[in-house]
Amino acid sequence: MSAQDFLVELGTEELPPKALNTLADAFLAGIEKGLHSAGLKFEAKKVYAAPRRLAVLLTALETQQPDRSINLDGPPRQAAFDAEGNPTQAALGFAKKCGVELSEIDQSGPKLRFSQVITGKPTASLLPTIVEDSLNDLPIPKRMRWGARKEEFVRPTQWLVMLLGDQVIDCTLLAQKAGRDSRGHRFHHPQAVRITSPANYAADLRAAYVLADANERRELISKRTEELARLQEGTAIVPPSLLDEVTALVEWPVPLVCSFEERFLDVPQEALITTMQDNQKYFCLLDVDGKLLPRFITVANIESKDPQQIIAGNEKVVRPRLTDAEFFFKQDKKQKLEDFNLRLQNVVFQEKLGSVYDKAVRVSKLAAYIAQRIGGDAAWAARAGLLSKCDLATEMVGEFPEMQGVAGYYYALNDGEPDDVALALNEQYMPRGAGAELPTTLTGAAVAIADKLDTLVGIFGIGMLPTGSKDPYALRRAALGVLRILIDKKLDLDLTQAVVFAVGQFGAKVKQAGLAEQVLEFVFDRLRARYEDEGVDVSVYLSVRALQPGSALDFDQRVQAVQAFRKLPEADALASVNKRVSNLLSKAEGLGNADVDPGLFADAKEFSLNSAIAKAENAVKPLIAERNYAEALARLATLREPVDAFFEAVMINAEDAGVRKNRYAMLARLRGLFVNIADISTLS
């Protein structure tokens, strides 16, 4: 079957940069979907996206749709005709469904059957509808109209190229008649660009100062920015999201180095970086020590004969932004950080839970409680907790919300607070996302945990539980944050006690009954997803969850031990035995509560198992005390042989009540060895 390259390019006014890649991928996916439905194949695909265009190139697209056979079975003959041979409603309905007369239906078989061969259409006749459907299905939250037209799109359209080989597809989409003329760079090549063939699309546009391939532009910007930063003896900060956005803003990227006055370096560099990245889309430069350099890189969309003019323009634009940050910083420092708490007394945290200041007081007390139990300084934690929300009332955070915590850190240092207290004001928000940085100090960890637990307890206490995708107070993230800090920083905190302490601080503001249990269940339930992501089988998680350890660190240590135990050759057999023993004990009320009496043993295997259990108890007890659960389980794995021999030789439910009770007591003792670590019966 013959094939031709296919190109479609929709030209527009400047597209939303943050949505450009999504729109391009969806455009390609929609066209692929339409071609698949039509039974049309192609060899390769390529999507192009630039500020003023979306394009798709398909290599070797079939030019003719293949013929299709339709075979539909209808009702059985006996149901299709009555005794006189007249068609029933079932037969007539089937014919109507097929869109033909009953006489065109095959009646020779046991069922009515409709067969038809549909001749394929030329691909050129199908493409307009396929492209139109793809454009209509693009994920555009809000479409716009322009001029007096009825058509709607994310931005006004300007031109349309649609070629199948050398043939222009005759159609009009979104008010644009298809042709072979594209447009070049708005300034370097404003006139039309004739696309010589689909395969030459990128080359034709390159000659007109347009790099249509977003990946090519991205790579060019990244590489050139890195080179320029190196020439400035620095390293560029290039967040992937910012790189994507800048890539979507330019058709012909030209990175340039600009500078600003060194006096602005007295302002917290995070504020300067925030305003330059978010507002101006600049790449900031850091020196070898991670300090901000008074230079930045802008990406121009033009190859200027006088680049210094562009540089001067950008330096002029950024100066007021940096001046604002400098002003806010100086204004805020005119009063002590603690004084901002007065403003927070009038700022509502949650209507039923009081002000932001009330929250800070609770966090202060809870942080001190936690610090005492993880080896931190309670006084520092209390102080950091009390100051934790002060910067929310500052001018700096009011202008740059991303500076919360960071601003507090600088203002606390300015006031002479201890370094750990200052650091904790920023670290309270850690981790800020999955895999993000954790607190580096015990004070920061204590405040971070306290802040999150206070939010969890408070919001749960007024019944505002997260449902489905709705989690306005980010409670899931808070719970995961608490767990990550405790486990990854190896902090042994009894969460049960900490949550009970947190509940007590709210008094009558929350429903106390069962609240601590509800919060703890929610927090520890988050571990299931964490372990699944790490490749830990859910049965391992459940084996530890059954014991309900109060410490997240202890929980994790048990999980890691059980995960290692699962790999031992004895694991499956012992898990099955534990399950069997668990079932037996659950049905034998009270039989497992007695002490084991060797005088009632009737079989040598009972003596052997009892001796093995005693040895295991002596070996395992100190290991469990040290939380060396992996070694303890490895030691318990040696019980497999005497356990197997016992079950083969001994009937548990002996006729003699005393013997029976004694055997159940020994099984309870055996199970207790494992349950001190995890309920491994869940592994079976």
UniProtKB/Swiss-Prot annotation:
Subunit structure comment from the entry: Tetramer of two alpha and two beta subunits.
Listed name of the protein: Glycine--tRNA ligase beta subunit
Catalytic activity: tRNA(Gly) + glycine + ATP = glycyl-tRNA(Gly) + AMP + diphosphate
One Gene Ontology CC term in the entry: cytosol
The protein's enzyme class: ligase
Compartment(s) of residence: Cytoplasm
Keyword Cell wall biogenesis/degradation applies: no
E.C. numbers: 6.1.1.14
Keywords linked to the UniProt accession: Aminoacyl-tRNA synthetase, ATP-binding, Cytoplasm, Ligase, Nucleotide-binding, Protein biosynthesis
InterPro entries in alphabetical order: DALR_anticod-bd (IPR008909), Gly-tRNA-synth_bsu (IPR015944), Gly-tRNA-synth_heterodimer (IPR006194)
A UniProt-annotated Pfam family: DALR_1
SUPFAM superfamilies: HD-domain/PDEase-like
Organism: Pseudomonas fluorescens (strain SBW25)
GO-annotated molecular function: arginine-tRNA ligase activity; ATP binding; glycine-tRNA ligase activity
Family label: Belongs to the class-II aminoacyl-tRNA synthetase family.
Biological processes annotated in GO: arginyl-tRNA aminoacylation; glycyl-tRNA aminoacylation
Keyword Glycosyltransferase among record annotations: no
